[in-house]
Amino acid sequence: MNNLSLSLAADYKAMVVSNPFDGSPVGEVMDMPASSATPLIDTALLGALVARELPRHERARILEATASGVEADRDAFARLIVAESGKTLKQARKEVSRCINTLKLSAEEARRNAGEMIPFDAYAGSESRQGWYTREPLGVIVAITPYNDPLNLVAHKLGPAIAGGNAVVLKPSELTPLSAIKLVGCLIDAGLPPGVVSVATGGAALGKALVAHRAVRMVSFTGGFVTGEQISRIAGLKKLAMDLGGNAPVIVMADSDLAAAIDACVSGAFWAAGQNCIGTQRILIEAPAFDAFKKGFVEKTRALVVGDPADERTDVGPMISEAAAKRAEALVNEAVDHGATLLFGNLRVGSLYSPTVLENVGCDCPLWYEEVFSPVVMLQSVGSLEEALTLANELQYSLHAGIFTRDLNVALSAAKRLEAGGVMINDSSDFRFDAMPFGGFKYGSMGREGVRFAYEEMTQPKVVCLNHTGTGASVISPGKTTTSF
């Protein structure tokens, strides 16, 4: 929370956070109206004055102490993620571990990334000058995070922003705000000064008001393409960083290790019930390997346990809502009606939607060209690498792609030609290391995340140039006289 939220809590109605699996209440937060945007930003403006003056070692200490706080309470964090998002316990535990790593990486960035010297004497006429540039804070950043990674994606915005000396107004998804609030509590316990991070809980009207506020210098958004377009229209002259979605292809060549490819693609397709912007959605298999891959993939999918995400044995939990599961079901039914073959799945009970595998989905079907964001994957036989690359590159989303092959030349050629922000060789599209640059080509994103790269997005360079010409001397250049100190 924040001091503003606590002082106004009595004036706002409650917003209930529900468990996607059984609908039970998990907690309540304030449903803050659009009118709260200005006081939130005013608080952040004061916090920004404090944040920019925090020594780098203190920023790093706070982030490291926060990582330790999350570590000490990791089981409670994991169970909260399960309760509010529907992720399975094993998936939630992995997310907590990644959050700890993200915070530690951010602490390292606070100490390391401070600019560099500039060789002014590299060009004639500047021999008397020396200087450097530093990375300076932007000021107030609005960070908007989604429901599918309710803890680590928050850390990916707060960590680099704090490392860079900024203040942040964080608007977590109204579906999963509790993990974010708990993380901010750890930051406060670690000594983060008041106003440096505020939490804004509410719906779209609040988000629009925050994005449109003139005092905000940057909006960092992870979410859907439609919302991203709306933000770009109303933000005005602000820096924007966005991760907007994906429809990730994976190419499987006939010479690949099929067992490894099947294991990786099953995980890549169905992790977090497919609610994953780099999740594997289309698998393009070279024809000689297609039947064997299909058989093994369906067998592995059939073995997945679907059910209560709090059960240690569960592999696939619910989607975020029954409406989301119904959307997936409708897209699959439409594809089948237009000639696709259902190989497994398409069973729904409430918000639970079974892992679903299809083949021969038409390229004109929404299931093929939209981001499905559900546990649905399509298999497609291809005659060559060229055909696979054409199909892989034809869509507007382009975060990650993957290719399986034993041929290094094929792998490197595909990596060069795939239009994606990241190409995973002998891995599914669903691999992300929190230190690497993360983003896409085309409409997949604007800017990059990954701690170092987000730090650079959230700071700005300032050049300092010193002209030292000797005591009492002066330098005369055509049309200009410069006198030394």
Curated annotation (Swiss-Prot):
InterPro entries: Ald_DH/histidinol_DH (IPR016161), Ald_DH_C (IPR016163), Ald_DH_N (IPR016162), Aldehyde_DH_dom (IPR015590), ALDH-related_metabolic_enz (IPR051020). The keyword Oxidoreductase applies. Keywords: NAD, Oxidoreductase. NAD(+) binds at residues 145, 171, 245, 371. Its EC number is 1.2.1.-. It holds the Pfam family Aldedh. PANTHER family: ALDEHYDE DEHYDROGENASE. Dehydrogenase involved in the degradation of canavanine, the delta-oxa-analog of arginine, allowing growth on canavanine as sole nitrogen and carbon source. Probably catalyzes the NAD(+)-dependent oxidation of L-aspartate-semialdehyde to L-aspartate. It is an enzyme of class 1 (oxidoreductase). This is Aspartate-semialdehyde dehydrogenase 2. Belongs to the aldehyde dehydrogenase family. One of its GO terms (molecular function) is lactaldehyde dehydrogenase (NAD+) activity. It catalyses: L-aspartate 4-semialdehyde + NAD(+) + H2O = L-aspartate + NADH + 2 H(+). Signal peptide: none annotated. Induction: Up-regulated upon growth on canavanine. The active site is at residues 243, 277.
